[in-house]
Amino acid sequence: MKLLHLDSSALGATSISRELSAAIVAQQRRLYPEVEVTYRDLDRDPIPHLTAQTLAQTDPAEAAAAEAVMQQFLQAEVIVIGAPMYNFAIPSTLKAWIDRIAVAGRTFHYTANGPEGLAGGKRLIIASARGGVYAEPSNDFQEPYLRQLFGFLGIDDITLVRAEGVAYSPQHRADALAAALAGLCAEQDAAVMA
């Protein structure tokens, strides 16, 4: 099994989404010892944002890098994304990666009945971290966007592991992380029992 692990937080070692995504990958390694993990840190190794130049693919090195990103995505059976909420949405580095994998004719296509995803059969696990609590849907453009986008690509097996309110206080941060990790442990126990 191939697993693609992406982190997008700019906070480095203090990032909750990175801690959660690492815990998710560790869980997958315990459940599936044969798993092959490919890791990409989108903050330390960002993908260039789309521009007229990158879309034209006149630079062979840029075209090869874009194809490598696409192949990592296509070959992965499980994708783990560390996705913090930045300004009600996702980091621009994660959006730049999405722009490289959401490609007509590769991961979706248009039909007479509407668009159809071509990237089905994958499992997506999102490690979501938020400084506040966003129970009001009108303030959350992060999780609905990710669900919609990956659903559009044909991925319907999507799990969210969420830590909210981490900026309220050190205690809130610890409690939110503990709750998210406890949920992850419960999911692992259920998988082992199945």
Swiss-Prot record:
Molecular function GO labels: electron transfer activity; FMN binding; oxidoreductase activity, acting on NAD(P)H as acceptor; oxidoreductase activity, acting on NAD(P)H, quinone or similar compound as acceptor
Keyword Transmembrane helix applies: no
EC number: 1.6.5.-, 1.7.1.17
Presence of keyword rRNA processing: no
Catalytic activity: 2 a quinone + NADH + H(+) = 2 a 1,4-benzosemiquinone + NAD(+); N,N-dimethyl-1,4-phenylenediamine + anthranilate + 2 NAD(+) = 2-(4-dimethylaminophenyl)diazenylbenzoate + 2 NADH + 2 H(+)
Cofactor comment text: Binds 1 FMN per subunit.
Coiled coil location: none
Cofactor: FMN
EC class (word): oxidoreductase
Chain residues that bind FMN: S9, S15, I16, S17, M85, Y86, N87, F88
Keywords: Flavoprotein, FMN, NAD, Oxidoreductase
Purpose: Quinone reductase that provides resistance to thiol-specific stress caused by electrophilic quinones. Also exhibits azoreductase activity. Catalyzes the reductive cleavage of the azo bond in aromatic azo compounds to the corresponding amines.
Quaternary structure note: Homodimer.
Database matches in PANTHER family: FMN-DEPENDENT NADH-AZOREDUCTASE 1, FMN-DEPENDENT NADH:QUINONE OXIDOREDUCTASE
Protein name (record): FMN-dependent NADH:quinone oxidoreductase
